Curated annotation (Swiss-Prot):
Residues 1-45 form the F-box domain. SMART domains: FBOX (SM00256). Gene3D superfamilies: 1.20.1280.50. InterPro entries: F-box-assoc_dom_typ1 (IPR006527), F-box-assoc_interact_dom (IPR017451), F-box-like_dom_sf (IPR036047), F-box_dom (IPR001810), SCF_F-box_component (IPR050796). This is Putative F-box protein At3g17620.
């Protein structure tokens, strides 16, 4: 029997179990459960997961307000093989909270920050460790207010302290409050922030090296000839200093009607998708250096005329995407080509030399929200809840 194998050999075998099946393996045998919690096994298992990522992407997808672990396989696409996108497991918790509709997910160091559709509930989740932490808002929520959330960490000498940032835009008062939550102390604090910029409520931040980046614009833009001239730039929140950095330049010059979206590359670089409304020309740029106070951009990663391919512009707020640097392709997640009455969710795979493929993600039940995708890398990060017992979550094969 497998349970009778020597520990080192058993550890080697278990390390090959996919993340989605690890929880089931833990409950198969008491010895396996004990072994799976040891640091040596965790290190080996995460190394095995890193090896598997060389052949396919692991992402988290929000579809129909549910959260799925999804694999994207692009092997052989330039040699006649079709790409594949498969939902492998649904992320749920053990206390019935899988019935809650999730509208947004953010990833940082293996942790997922999930926001409920009605903005009343926020949860931090580590699917690898099956841990969840529900955050209680510091003040009552108001339906007419807007919220922007982000997750990151403070760098200590020997550890990382995870934090959640929340913007509360009080609609009636035209006032924005910035709050930060420390997972370790289980407490909210209000930050003293004075800004001459603003982040739109629909803007999605991207976490990188423990910090979060957004597109931002002037709070008081110039107006001439009755036209508003907004200037867009990159803005970083440093979770260690708990301060926003200076304005960082973009490699493009978007207008209000253009599509501009952020993504991460291997949790080391930022990528920008930029598509003009007037001619549907799409560009992808990638950073060569990215820090809270400095950014450098590579030469153009990809440039494609989308008019003969899709003949429509991706949504201003919904164009979530990933890129494969080696294969020189971008995967954009949106609705089908019927702009007025879409019936299906679709992944558009676009590359050099005219490469173009569509992958049907199934019928859509949400006419407003496009599929939302963010990168996911499993980690052994612990969710600490101020001494309180953590609730458990799990992966269920879809």
């Amino acid at each position: 029997m497998m349970s009778d194998l020597p520990r080192d050999l058993l550890e080697e075998r278990l390390s090959r179990v996919p993340v989605k099946s690890l929880r089931e393996a833990r409950f198969t045998c008491k010895n396996w459960k004990t072994l799976s919690k040891k640091r040596s096994f965790t290190k080996k298992h995460l190394a095995q997961e890193a090896t598997s990522r060389e052949s396919e992407f692991k992402v988290v997808m929000v579809l129909h307000c549910k959260v799925y672990l999804t694999s994207i396989n692009l092997r052989g696409i330039h040699n006649g093989f079709d790409p594949s996108i498969n939902r492998q497991a649904k992320l749920v918790s053990l206390n019935g909270t899988d019935q809650i509709d999730i509208s947004e997910v953010y990833h940082c160091d293996g942790l997922l920050l999930c926001i409920s559709k009605d903005y009343t509930r926020v949860v931090v989740w580590n699917p690898y460790r099956s841990q969840t932490l529900w955050l209680k808002p510091s003040s009552p929520d108001h339906r007419m207010d807007w919220y922007i959330c982000a997750i990151g960490y403070e760098k200590r000498k020997s550890s990382l302290r995870y934090k959640v940032l929340r913007f509360v835009d009080f609609a009636e008062e035209e006032f924005v409050e910035y709050e930060i939550y420390e997972l370790k102390s289980n407490s909210w604090r209000v930050l003293d922030v004075t800004s001459d910029w603003e982040v739109e409520f629909y803007a999605r931040g991207v976490s990188l090296k423990g910090n979060t980046y957004w597109f931002a614009t002037d709070k008081f833009p110039e107006i001439s000839s009755n036209l508003i001239h907004s200037v867009y730039f990159l803005l970083c929140f440093n979770f260690t200093s708990e301060r926003f950095g200076p304005r960082l330049h973009l490699p493009c010059y978007p207008m209000d009607v253009d599509t501009v979206s952020l993504s991460s590359v291997r949790e080391e670089q930022l990528a920008v998708l930029f598509q003009r409304k007037d001619n549907l020309h799409m560009e992808i740029w990638v950073t060569t250096k990215i820090e809270p106070e400095e950014v450098m951009w590579s030469k153009l990663f990809l440039a494609v005329d989308m008019q003969p391919l899709t003949d429509f512009k991706f949504g201003i707020a919904d164009a979530s995407f990933i890129i494969d640097e080696e294969k020189k392709v971008v995967v954009v997640f949106a609705k089908d080509k019927d702009v007025m009455y879409p019936t299906h969710n679709t992944a558009y795979i676009i590359g050099e030399d005219g490469y173009y493929k569509e992958v049907d993600l199934g019928k859509t039940t949400d006419k407003i929200r496009d599929p939302l995708v963010c990168s996911y890398v499993p980690s052994s990060a612990q969710i600490k809840q101020g001494g309180k017992r953590k609730k458990k979550g799990k992966l269920i094969t879809d």
